[in-house]
């Protein structure tokens, strides 16, 4: 059976502009070796949207970092070693001089404060940028749903039951010393996906939700080159990654959001962005096969969403 070409278990949550960030405490961490790591370490997956976002951010900042690739296709994030680092089982994870940070927007907020130059969050506008990034996080499950239906299209269950069993059983179960409900929400999503698949109705709703968000972004880009004005910011990074994923899914940006499409093409030409979303040949071939089958069945995203 064909393996999935890019499933991801990431979450872009964060509190940019607030002082509270998700840094784990020692009791949360069972894989104790990371407490001795020095420098900037990133646990990530090539095809994870939130990992891609963080890598672009690191590129633009010029921050040296050590890579630890976590193979989500092999469900390595559901194994005891990784769950001992992040009990939520999500990538990316930052370990900086032994301190473990989770949730990509929180990681970015931490790195922006720790490595302030060049600025990617406009000074004095942290709360505004944080509020806009919240829209990205609120759409996390919508992006995952459309990705699995129109990009990855796995032939079997979205997540194997034995992997979910390991996910439920391992890790501390706490974040910042408090029992954490996030894992239960993740398991509920995957169990429903395994049972019902990614239905037309759910995908249509997710696509329409994105359309409303991109309508708003298109209006912004009608009068300015970047999402927050004249300078590139973390908002551009975050929404570039979502735009890239949805473009792979067949979302008709040129038709519906021409300003977003032009902005996306401009950023996609920059190596700091392009190299982090480049697809290996086998993934490109799989996507072409998926698209061909969906076209023959009248099940392209544009058709399902009634765009």
Region roles according to the model:
Residues 141-265:
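GST-like fold's C-terminal all-alpha helical module
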Residues 14, 37-38, 55, 64-68, ...:
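N-terminal start-of-chain detector that recognizes signal peptides
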Residues 14-183, 294, 304-307:
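GST-like domain detector, emphasizing the conserved glutathione-binding G-site
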């Amino acid at each position: 059976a064909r393996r999935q070409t890019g499933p991801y278990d990431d979450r872009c949550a964060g509190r940019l502009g607030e002082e509270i960030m998700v840094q784990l405490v020692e009791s949360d961490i069972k894989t104790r070796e990371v407490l001795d790591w020095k420098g900037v370490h990133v646990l990530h997956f090539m095809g994870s949207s939130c990992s891609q976002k963080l890598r672009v951010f690191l590129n633009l900042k010029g921050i040296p970092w050590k890579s630890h690739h976590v193979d989500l296709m092999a469900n390595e994030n559901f194994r005891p070693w990784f769950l001992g680092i992040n009990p939520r089982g999500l990538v990316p994870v930052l370990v900086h001089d032994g301190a473990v940070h989770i949730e990509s927007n929180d990681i970015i907020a931490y790195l922006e404060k720790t490595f302030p130059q060049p600025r990617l969050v406009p000074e004095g506008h942290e709360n505004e940028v944080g509020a806009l990034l919240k829209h990205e996080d609120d759409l996390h499950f919508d992006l995952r749903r459309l990705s699995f239906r129109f990009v990855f299209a796995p032939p079997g269950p979205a997540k194997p039951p034995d992997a979910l069993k390991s996910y439920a059983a391992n890790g501390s179960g706490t974040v910042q010393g408090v029992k954490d409900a996030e894992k239960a929400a993740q398991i509920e999503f995957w169990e429903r996906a395994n049972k019902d698949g990614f239905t037309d109705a759910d995908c249509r709703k997710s696509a329409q939700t994105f359309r409303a968000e991109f309508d708003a972004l298109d209006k912004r880009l009608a009068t300015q080159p970047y999402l927050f004005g004249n300078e590139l910011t973390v908002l551009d990074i975050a929404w570039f990654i979502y735009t890239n994923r949805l473009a792979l899914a067949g979302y008709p940006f040129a038709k519906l959001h021409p300003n977003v499409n032009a902005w996306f093409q401009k950023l996609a030409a920059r190596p700091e962005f392009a190299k982090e979303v480049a697809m290996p040949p086998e993934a490109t071939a799989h996507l072409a096969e998926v698209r061909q089958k969906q076209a023959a069945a009248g099940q392209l995203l544009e058709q399902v969403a009634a765009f």
